[in-house]
């Protein structure tokens, strides 16, 4: 599989997993209800008009603009990946692909519904969804790849 295909397949799989999971939750669980009703791990159906940790509540236009910018940045990174050796690898392109998937997954909700469907609650952590997980895992993956590639290439500069 070519590296470009790796990027697009990881993006498509992430978007599909996000949108399918939200469809299943919306079709089977009333807003505000959870399974189980209490406990450390719950599946709960909530609408979030904000971003992570519910910041920017009610500012959908800013969140849509930020998401569009995120899509542009991810696509730009894909097209200039040859200049970023840590990114021009299968793991780098998978990480970038799931970042794009998370951004697009939540952007679809915001444009279509005016909010994001969240449904995973773990302990006291704010409720989140598959798109949020894609973003988090992708960003952490890219950071780790960057750090490892910096050490491997012998870059010891403090200007990171």
From Swiss-Prot:
Signal peptide positions (record):
none
Q: Is Cell membrane among the key words of this record? A: yes
Q: Name one GO molecular function term.
A: aspartic-type endopeptidase activity
Q: What is this protein called?
A: Lipoprotein signal peptidase
Question: What top-tier enzyme class does this entry carry?
Answer: hydrolase
Stored PROSITE patterns: SPASE_II (PS00855)
Q: Which GO terms describe its biological process?
A: proteolysis
Highest taxon, organism lineage = Bacteria
Catalytic residues, per the record, are 118, 132
**Would you identify the family this protein belongs to, as annotated?**
Belongs to the peptidase A8 family.
Pathway it acts in? Protein modification; lipoprotein biosynthesis (signal peptide cleavage)
Quick one: a GO cellular component term? plasma membrane
Q: Which residues cross the membrane?
A: 5-25, 60-80, 84-104, 128-148
Listed A to Z, the keywords are: Aspartyl protease, Cell membrane, Hydrolase, Membrane, Protease, Transmembrane, Transmembrane helix
What are the leading ranks of the lineage? Answer: Bacteria, Bacillati, Chloroflexota, Dehalococcoidia, Dehalococcoidales
InterPro entries, A to Z: Peptidase_A8
Bilayer topology term: Multi-pass membrane protein
Q: State its location(s).
A: Cell membrane
């Amino acid at each position: 599989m070519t590296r470009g295909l790796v990027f697009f397949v990881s993006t498509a799989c992430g978007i599909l997993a996000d949108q399918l999971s939200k469809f299943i939750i919306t079709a089977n669980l009333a807003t505000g209800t959870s399974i189980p009703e209490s406990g450390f791990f719950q599946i709960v159906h909530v609408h979030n008009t904000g971003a992570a940790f519910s910041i920017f509540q009610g500012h959908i236009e800013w969140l849509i603009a930020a998401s569009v910018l995120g899509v542009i940045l991810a696509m730009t990174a894909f097209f200039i990946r040859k200049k970023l050796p840590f990114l021009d690898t299968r793991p780098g392109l998978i990480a970038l692909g799931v970042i794009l998937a998370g951004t697009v997954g939540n952007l679809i909700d915001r444009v279509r519904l005016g909010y994001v469907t969240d449904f995973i609650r773990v302990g006291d952590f704010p409720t989140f969804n598959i798109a949020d997980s894609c973003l988090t895992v992708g960003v952490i993956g890219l950071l780790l790849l960057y750090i490892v590639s910096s050490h491997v290439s012998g870059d010891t500069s403090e200007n990171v």
